Regions:
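A short, charged, amphipathic alpha-helix used as a generic interaction element across diverse proteins
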Residues: 10, 22-46
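A generic structural signal for ordered secondary structure
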Residues: 3-7, 32, 49
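Short aromatic-glycine-(Arg/Gly/Cys) micro-motifs in beta-strand/loop hairpins
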Residues: 1-18
Length: 65
C-alpha cells in the first residue's frame, strides 16, 4: 500500500504528534489548514506539508521566514 505523495506532520517542540499522507495535493492542503486550526495553539507547534516525491516543503506553519 502506498502511503501517498503528500505528507502533513504536526510536531510539538520537535517531537511528532500526528502525520498523514495523501495522494492529492489539494486534499493534503485542506488537511494542513485543518490541523493548523486544531493543533496550532499547542506550545511549540509546527505543521508542515512535504512533497515526499521531491522532498520539497510546500508550506509550513508558522512560516519559517
Amino acid at each position: 500500500m502506498n502511503a501517498g505523495r503528500y505528507r502533513v506532520t504536526v510536531t510539538t517542540d520537535g517531537a511528532p504528534l500526528i502525520q498523514g499522507w495523501w495522494d492529492d495535493e489539494a486534499t493534503a492542503r485542506r488537511k494542513f489548514a485543518s490541523w493548523v486550526g486544531e493543533h496550532g495553539d499547542r506550545p511549540g507547534a509546527r505543521v508542515t506539508l512535504v512533497d515526499e516525491q521531491t522532498g520539497v516543503v510546500l508550506t509550513e506553519w508558522p512560516d519559517a521566514r
